[in-house]
C-alpha cells in the first residue's frame, strides 16, 4: 500500500503512506454497519475518532451522503493523509454539492492553525479546499471535553487495540505501520475504556457508538 500511495476502500481510493495505518477490508463492514444505524435520520451528526486515513468517516459519508461527519486524528503524519482524503477521496462518487463542507465550516471548528510557510499560506488563503468530511487534529483522550451533550447520532472509531505483548510479535509487514495506530496499553483496552467513559454523553437519545 505504501509503495502504491493509495488503496481501495469500498468504491473509492484513499491516499496512504508512511505514518498512517492502511485500511483493512473488514473496516468496510464496520462502515456499512455504522451507516445503517442512521437510517431515517435526515442530517445525522457523526464523529470518527482515531480516524487515520478517514476511511470509517468517509465510508459512512459514502453510504449516507447527508451525514455531517467530523474526523479526529492525533498524529500529525496521519493527519496529512486524512486532510487529503477528506478533500479528494469522494470526488466523483456521486456527492451532491450541499454535502461538501465549504472552508467556512472548517474554519468555525476548533482546528489548530498550521504554519505552511509564506507561499503556501498565501495559496491556501486564496484557494481553500472543500471537504466531504471535516478533518480535525485532536486527541481521543481529551476531545470529548469540547463536545456538547446529546448532539451526535453516531460515534465511530477503530482505535488501537493491540496489547504490549502483541506489539512484540507483529508480522514484518504490520511492523512497518505506525505503532501509535496499533498499541493500546498492557491489555489493549485503554482506548475502548476512554470511549465508553467519556463519549456516551455526547450521543443523543438513540445514538450509537460503533
Residue positions per predicted region:
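Internal, well-ordered alpha/beta segment that forms a basic, Gly-enriched binding/recognition surface
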Residues: 103
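Exposed boundary/loop context
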Residues: 52, 109-110, 117-120
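S-adenosylmethionine
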Residues: 63-67, 72-94, 106, 114-116, ...
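Short, conserved catalytic or adaptor-binding loops enriched in Gly and charged residues
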Residues: 6-8, 123-128
